[in-house]
Amino acid sequence: MPYTSNPAKIQRTPNTQNSGVNQPPVFEPITPIKVSERWFPKDRRFGLYECGGRVAPNVTSILGWKFPFDKAKWKKSEPNIDHDAVTRESAKRGTAVHLAMEKWLQSHGHAPVEEHLQWINPLQSLVSRASKTLAVEVPLHHSIHGVGAYAGSCDGVMLVNDDVVLIDYKTKRHGKEVLPKFCEQQRLQLAAYSLAISHLYKDQLPAPVTRTSLLFAHPEDGKPVTVVSTQGNLLLEYQQKWLDLLGEWYEVHGDQVAYEQNNFDEQLKLSTW
Protein backbone atom coordinates (compact mmCIF):
# COMPACT_ATOMS: atom_id res chain seq x y z
CA MET A 1 0.00 0.00 0.00
CA PRO A 2 1.38 3.45 -0.88
CA TYR A 3 2.77 5.45 2.01
CA THR A 4 0.77 8.55 2.79
CA SER A 5 2.10 11.48 4.75
CA ASN A 6 0.52 14.03 7.00
CA PRO A 7 2.51 17.03 8.22
CA ALA A 8 4.38 15.82 11.29
CA LYS A 9 4.70 18.32 14.07
CA ILE A 10 8.17 17.66 15.48
CA GLN A 11 8.58 19.09 18.96
CA ARG A 12 12.01 20.53 19.58
CA THR A 13 14.39 18.54 21.79
CA PRO A 14 17.69 19.97 20.61
CA ASN A 15 21.10 18.32 20.76
CA THR A 16 22.85 21.00 22.78
CA GLN A 17 25.93 21.63 24.87
CA ASN A 18 26.05 23.64 28.07
CA SER A 19 26.07 26.85 26.07
CA GLY A 20 22.53 26.12 24.93
CA VAL A 21 23.54 26.44 21.29
CA ASN A 22 22.32 23.76 18.90
CA GLN A 23 25.20 21.59 17.74
CA PRO A 24 25.18 20.38 14.12
CA PRO A 25 25.39 16.69 13.25
CA VAL A 26 28.78 15.18 12.46
CA PHE A 27 29.90 16.52 9.08
CA GLU A 28 31.25 13.78 6.80
CA PRO A 29 30.68 15.23 3.33
CA ILE A 30 30.70 13.41 0.05
CA THR A 31 32.76 14.86 -2.80
CA PRO A 32 30.46 16.91 -5.05
CA ILE A 33 30.55 16.81 -8.83
CA LYS A 34 31.61 19.97 -10.63
CA VAL A 35 28.68 21.91 -12.04
CA SER A 36 28.74 25.45 -13.43
CA GLU A 37 26.87 28.40 -12.03
CA ARG A 38 23.37 28.74 -13.40
CA TRP A 39 22.75 31.14 -16.27
CA PHE A 40 19.63 32.21 -18.15
CA PRO A 41 19.88 32.25 -21.95
CA LYS A 42 18.34 35.25 -23.67
CA ASP A 43 14.61 34.93 -24.42
CA ARG A 44 14.37 31.56 -22.64
CA ARG A 45 12.12 30.73 -19.73
CA PHE A 46 14.57 28.31 -18.21
CA GLY A 47 17.99 28.42 -16.63
CA LEU A 48 20.88 26.16 -17.53
CA TYR A 49 23.76 24.44 -15.77
CA GLU A 50 26.75 22.85 -17.48
CA CYS A 51 28.64 19.75 -16.45
CA GLY A 52 31.14 17.82 -18.55
CA GLY A 53 30.28 19.90 -21.60
CA ARG A 54 26.54 19.22 -21.46
CA VAL A 55 23.94 21.85 -20.63
CA ALA A 56 20.81 20.99 -18.68
CA PRO A 57 17.76 22.97 -17.54
CA ASN A 58 17.28 23.55 -13.84
CA VAL A 59 14.56 21.65 -12.04
CA THR A 60 12.84 24.76 -10.72
CA SER A 61 12.38 26.14 -14.24
CA ILE A 62 10.76 22.90 -15.36
CA LEU A 63 8.44 22.94 -12.35
CA GLY A 64 7.66 26.62 -12.94
CA TRP A 65 6.42 25.66 -16.41
CA LYS A 66 4.14 23.00 -14.94
CA PHE A 67 3.01 25.10 -11.95
CA PRO A 68 2.96 28.75 -13.10
CA PHE A 69 2.53 31.21 -10.26
CA ASP A 70 -0.88 32.90 -10.32
CA LYS A 71 -0.27 36.32 -8.80
CA ALA A 72 -3.81 37.48 -9.58
CA LYS A 73 -5.21 34.60 -7.52
CA TRP A 74 -2.87 35.45 -4.66
CA LYS A 75 -3.94 39.12 -4.74
CA LYS A 76 -7.58 38.08 -4.62
CA SER A 77 -7.01 35.76 -1.67
CA GLU A 78 -5.00 38.36 0.30
CA PRO A 79 -6.14 41.79 -0.90
CA ASN A 80 -4.89 43.78 2.09
CA ILE A 81 -1.15 43.18 1.89
CA ASP A 82 1.69 44.71 -0.12
CA HIS A 83 2.36 41.74 -2.40
CA ASP A 84 5.61 43.08 -3.85
CA ALA A 85 6.97 43.80 -0.38
CA VAL A 86 5.97 40.33 0.83
CA THR A 87 7.72 38.78 -2.18
CA ARG A 88 10.91 40.74 -1.53
CA GLU A 89 10.90 39.91 2.15
CA SER A 90 10.26 36.23 1.45
CA ALA A 91 13.22 36.04 -0.93
CA LYS A 92 15.47 37.88 1.54
CA ARG A 93 14.39 35.63 4.40
CA GLY A 94 14.83 32.45 2.38
CA THR A 95 18.34 33.41 1.29
CA ALA A 96 19.33 34.30 4.85
CA VAL A 97 17.94 31.10 6.35
CA HIS A 98 19.57 28.89 3.71
CA LEU A 99 22.93 30.59 4.24
CA ALA A 100 22.67 30.25 8.02
CA MET A 101 21.85 26.55 7.79
CA GLU A 102 24.65 25.95 5.29
CA LYS A 103 27.24 27.63 7.52
CA TRP A 104 25.95 25.95 10.68
CA LEU A 105 26.02 22.43 9.21
CA GLN A 106 29.65 22.96 8.19
CA SER A 107 30.56 24.56 11.54
CA HIS A 108 31.57 27.78 9.81
CA GLY A 109 31.27 30.99 11.76
CA HIS A 110 28.20 33.00 10.80
CA ALA A 111 26.04 35.53 12.61
CA PRO A 112 22.58 35.84 11.05
CA VAL A 113 20.53 38.92 11.80
CA GLU A 114 18.32 38.54 14.83
CA GLU A 115 15.02 38.88 12.96
CA HIS A 116 15.71 35.63 11.09
CA LEU A 117 16.49 33.55 14.18
CA GLN A 118 12.80 32.78 14.69
CA TRP A 119 13.05 30.55 11.59
CA ILE A 120 16.67 29.44 11.93
CA ASN A 121 16.58 28.23 15.53
CA PRO A 122 13.69 25.75 15.08
CA LEU A 123 15.31 24.32 11.94
CA GLN A 124 18.62 23.86 13.72
CA SER A 125 16.90 22.22 16.67
CA LEU A 126 15.27 19.69 14.37
CA VAL A 127 18.19 19.02 12.02
CA SER A 128 20.57 18.57 14.96
CA ARG A 129 18.86 15.21 15.55
CA ALA A 130 20.32 13.72 12.38
CA SER A 131 23.15 11.20 12.71
CA LYS A 132 25.40 12.83 10.08
CA THR A 133 25.47 15.51 7.44
CA LEU A 134 26.53 13.95 4.13
CA ALA A 135 26.20 16.99 1.88
CA VAL A 136 25.29 20.68 1.97
CA GLU A 137 24.06 22.46 -1.16
CA VAL A 138 24.97 19.38 -3.19
CA PRO A 139 24.99 19.95 -6.98
CA LEU A 140 23.34 17.54 -9.39
CA HIS A 141 23.39 17.22 -13.17
CA HIS A 142 21.67 14.07 -14.34
CA SER A 143 20.72 12.66 -17.73
CA ILE A 144 17.77 10.32 -18.29
CA HIS A 145 18.34 8.14 -21.35
CA GLY A 146 15.83 8.85 -24.08
CA VAL A 147 14.40 11.87 -22.28
CA GLY A 148 16.93 14.54 -21.38
CA ALA A 149 19.08 16.00 -18.64
CA TYR A 150 18.23 18.19 -15.67
CA ALA A 151 20.22 19.94 -12.97
CA GLY A 152 19.94 21.74 -9.67
CA SER A 153 21.16 21.87 -6.09
CA CYS A 154 19.76 20.23 -2.96
CA ASP A 155 19.83 21.93 0.44
CA GLY A 156 21.09 18.91 2.35
CA VAL A 157 21.66 15.17 2.40
CA MET A 158 21.43 13.71 5.89
CA LEU A 159 21.90 10.32 7.47
CA VAL A 160 19.04 9.74 9.90
CA ASN A 161 19.70 6.45 11.67
CA ASP A 162 20.25 4.23 8.60
CA ASP A 163 18.19 6.29 6.15
CA VAL A 164 19.63 8.70 3.59
CA VAL A 165 17.27 11.68 3.63
CA LEU A 166 17.12 14.76 1.41
CA ILE A 167 16.00 17.93 3.15
CA ASP A 168 14.72 21.24 1.83
CA TYR A 169 14.16 24.34 3.96
CA LYS A 170 11.04 26.45 3.66
CA THR A 171 9.98 29.49 5.68
CA LYS A 172 6.39 30.51 6.31
CA ARG A 173 4.90 33.87 7.18
CA HIS A 174 3.04 34.48 10.42
CA GLY A 175 -0.25 32.63 10.57
CA LYS A 176 0.45 30.40 7.57
CA GLU A 177 -0.26 26.68 7.77
CA VAL A 178 1.12 23.80 5.69
CA LEU A 179 -1.05 21.19 3.97
CA PRO A 180 0.58 18.26 2.11
CA LYS A 181 -1.99 18.48 -0.70
CA PHE A 182 -0.49 21.85 -1.63
CA CYS A 183 3.10 20.53 -1.66
CA GLU A 184 2.95 18.77 -5.03
CA GLN A 185 5.52 21.03 -6.68
CA GLN A 186 8.00 20.79 -3.81
CA ARG A 187 7.61 17.02 -3.56
CA LEU A 188 8.31 16.65 -7.27
CA GLN A 189 11.41 18.80 -6.87
CA LEU A 190 12.84 16.54 -4.18
CA ALA A 191 11.81 13.43 -6.13
CA ALA A 192 13.89 14.73 -9.05
CA TYR A 193 16.81 15.37 -6.73
CA SER A 194 16.50 11.94 -5.11
CA LEU A 195 16.78 10.14 -8.46
CA ALA A 196 19.82 12.18 -9.46
CA ILE A 197 21.66 12.04 -6.14
CA SER A 198 21.12 8.29 -5.69
CA HIS A 199 22.69 7.75 -9.12
CA LEU A 200 25.45 10.38 -9.13
CA TYR A 201 26.71 9.68 -5.63
CA LYS A 202 25.94 5.97 -5.32
CA ASP A 203 29.59 5.11 -4.64
CA GLN A 204 29.78 7.63 -1.80
CA LEU A 205 26.44 7.25 -0.07
CA PRO A 206 25.81 4.43 2.43
CA ALA A 207 22.50 3.69 0.65
CA PRO A 208 20.18 5.22 -1.95
CA VAL A 209 17.92 8.07 -0.88
CA THR A 210 14.93 6.56 0.91
CA ARG A 211 13.12 9.67 2.11
CA THR A 212 12.70 13.32 1.24
CA SER A 213 11.58 15.87 3.81
CA LEU A 214 10.29 19.39 3.36
CA LEU A 215 11.02 21.37 6.52
CA PHE A 216 8.66 24.31 6.97
CA ALA A 217 9.75 26.72 9.70
CA HIS A 218 7.14 28.97 11.33
CA PRO A 219 7.95 32.29 13.05
CA GLU A 220 5.47 31.83 15.90
CA ASP A 221 7.27 31.26 19.19
CA GLY A 222 7.10 27.62 20.28
CA LYS A 223 5.49 26.40 17.07
CA PRO A 224 7.31 23.31 15.80
CA VAL A 225 8.68 22.81 12.33
CA THR A 226 6.17 21.18 9.99
CA VAL A 227 7.73 18.21 8.20
CA VAL A 228 6.22 16.81 5.01
CA SER A 229 8.03 13.58 4.18
CA THR A 230 7.79 11.34 1.13
CA GLN A 231 9.07 7.78 1.24
CA GLY A 232 8.35 4.20 0.23
CA ASN A 233 5.86 3.69 -2.57
CA LEU A 234 4.86 7.34 -2.44
CA LEU A 235 8.41 8.42 -3.25
CA LEU A 236 8.47 5.97 -6.16
CA GLU A 237 5.22 7.50 -7.42
CA TYR A 238 6.64 11.01 -7.29
CA GLN A 239 9.83 9.92 -9.02
CA GLN A 240 7.73 8.51 -11.86
CA LYS A 241 5.64 11.69 -11.96
CA TRP A 242 8.86 13.66 -12.31
CA LEU A 243 10.09 11.49 -15.19
CA ASP A 244 6.74 11.93 -16.93
CA LEU A 245 6.91 15.70 -16.46
CA LEU A 246 10.50 15.80 -17.70
CA GLY A 247 9.41 14.02 -20.87
CA GLU A 248 6.55 16.49 -21.39
CA TRP A 249 8.88 19.44 -20.88
CA TYR A 250 11.42 18.17 -23.39
CA GLU A 251 8.70 17.57 -25.97
CA VAL A 252 8.03 21.32 -25.85
CA HIS A 253 11.51 22.69 -25.11
CA GLY A 254 13.87 20.03 -26.43
CA ASP A 255 14.74 21.98 -29.58
CA GLN A 256 15.52 25.06 -27.49
CA VAL A 257 17.87 23.09 -25.25
CA ALA A 258 19.57 21.61 -28.33
CA TYR A 259 20.02 25.14 -29.71
CA GLU A 260 21.59 26.32 -26.46
CA GLN A 261 23.83 23.25 -26.42
CA ASN A 262 25.06 24.17 -29.89
CA ASN A 263 25.69 27.75 -28.74
CA PHE A 264 27.67 26.48 -25.79
CA ASP A 265 29.74 24.17 -28.00
CA GLU A 266 30.50 27.01 -30.41
CA GLN A 267 31.55 29.34 -27.61
CA LEU A 268 33.76 26.61 -26.17
CA LYS A 269 35.49 26.17 -29.53
CA LEU A 270 36.12 29.90 -29.83
CA SER A 271 37.56 30.06 -26.32
CA THR A 272 40.08 27.30 -27.07
CA TRP A 273 41.45 28.87 -30.27
Regions found by a protein language model. Give the residues of each.
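Metal-dependent nuclease catalytic cores that hydrolyze phosphodiester bonds in DNA/RNA
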Residues: 2-151, 270-273
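Polar/charged alpha-helical tracts
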Residues: 28, 88, 107, 118, ...
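Mg2+/Mn2+-dependent nuclease catalytic core
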Residues: 138-253
